[in-house]
Swiss-Prot record:
Gene Ontology terms describing biological process: carnitine metabolic process
UniProt-listed HAMAP family: CaiE
Keywords carried by this UniProt record: Repeat, Transferase
Compositional bias ranges of the Basic and acidic residues kind: 180-198
Spans annotated as Disordered: 179-198
Xref: NCBIfam families: PRK13627.1
Protein name as it appears in the record: Carnitine operon protein CaiE
MF annotations from Gene Ontology: transferase activity
Free-text function comment from the UniProt entry: Overproduction of CaiE stimulates the activity of CaiB and CaiD.
Pathway the protein acts in: Amine and polyamine metabolism; carnitine metabolism
Family classification: Belongs to the transferase hexapeptide repeat family.
Length: 198
């Protein structure tokens, strides 16, 4: 892991969190229990404070940053998909930000909301609970259904389990030169594949 103090502020990481060795945490970063931070994530706490609350995840290639005197927060069980950018915003409890989405300064994503992949949430947007946000700029399409929220929670549970699995089962290695016979497949703990296109 790459941890850097900045002007006396040192990242804080709960011992039950998992931070991938290629992720970078700088300065005023606070990571809660059971958090998963994926490969190549960048958390630059060199201006504002960055907070990942318990059970949340920040996947591969995500970026967190914010202006001075602001907090960029992912609340409890928040789920941030691959390549998303969070800048000076707040993601509510149990909300999901889809892959390659951008959430701008002062925006608030309501609890149990879902931001669709590739969406752009404008600065200052003030969301409410259980909104499905889609597009660039993002607009409220409808309320999140119980089925969608259940699917989101299953996916978040997978990442909470992955944090545990990675703490014990991830190790740097050299690659094999050929595929071994009867190569096993990895399995998750739940069936999280989407049932149909939205």
């Amino acid at each position: 892991m790459s941890y850097y103090a900045f002007e006396g502020l040192i990242p804080v990481v709960h011992p039950d969190a998992f931070v991938h060795p290629s992720a970078v945490l700088i300065g005023d970063v606070i990571v809660g229990a059971g958090v998963y931070i994926g490969p190549l994530a960048s958390l630059r706490g060199d201006y504002g404070r960055l907070i990942l609350e318990a059970g949340s995840n920040l996947q591969d290639g995500c970026i967190m940053h914010g202006y001075c005197d602001t907090d960029t927060i992912v609340h409890e069980n928040g789920h941030i998909g691959h390549g998303a950018i969070l800048h000076g915003c707040v993601v509510g409890r149990d909300a999901l930000v889809g892959m390659n989405s951008v959430i701008m300064d002062g925006a608030v994503i309501g609890e149990e909301s879902i931001v669709a992949a590739m969406s752009f949430v404008k600065a200052g947007f003030q969301g409410e609970a259980r909104q499905l946000l889609v597009g660039s700029p993002a607009r409220v399409l409808r309320q999140v259904t119980d089925q969608e929220l259940h699917w989101k929670r299953l996916n978040t549970k997978e990442y909470q389990d992955l944090a545990i699995r990675c703490r014990t089962g991830l190790s740097e290695t050299k690659p094999l030169t050929q595929v071994e016979e009867n190569r096993p497949r990895l399995k998750g703990t739940t069936d999280v594949k989407p049932k149909s296109a939205q």
